[in-house]
């Protein structure tokens, strides 16, 4: 599993500037400036998952000005990128054996419930295997 430090190092290696902001969205990707901003004061788990999502946008070359269906497609891709890198199939299986609830699985994995849901959707849809080949 990636850590905040790993993700920050990856972002920097991609030429992305990291900064913070107060209030508003948890995270922002600004493609023209090649910058990621994370809201100050986030819980460490939310910080990790938000940063992973935004680094996904950067890695995938997303257009931060996209709207409509194109933006939705980019959001889904960034969610999947983050989930694939934060949760392995082995870690997920172990967490699910220990905890019957979605929130318990998320807690065990050290990620948000939203990230577990993104991982589950990717696994159910069969896209998880494609991400394994692309990793």
Sequence positions of predicted segments:
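Active-site hotspot residues in diverse enzymes, especially metal/ion-binding acidic/histidine motifs
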Residues: 1-135
């Amino acid at each position: 599993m990636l850590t905040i430090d790993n993700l920050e190092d990856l972002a920097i290696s991609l030429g992305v500037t990291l900064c913070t902001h107060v209030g508003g969205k948890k995270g922002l990707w600004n493609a023209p400036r090649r910058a990621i901003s994370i809201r100050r004061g986030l819980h460490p788990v939310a910080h990790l998952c938000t940063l992973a999502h935004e680094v996904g946008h950067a890695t995938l070359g997303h257009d931060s000005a996209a709207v409509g269906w194109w933006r939705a497609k980019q959001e889904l891709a960034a969610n999947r990128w983050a989930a694939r890198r934060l949760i392995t199939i082995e870690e997920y299986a172990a967490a699910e054996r220990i905890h019957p609830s979605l929130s318990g699985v998320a807690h065990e994995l050290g990620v948000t419930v939203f990230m577990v849901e993104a991982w589950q959707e990717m696994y159910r849809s069969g896209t998880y295997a494609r991400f394994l080949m692309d990793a």
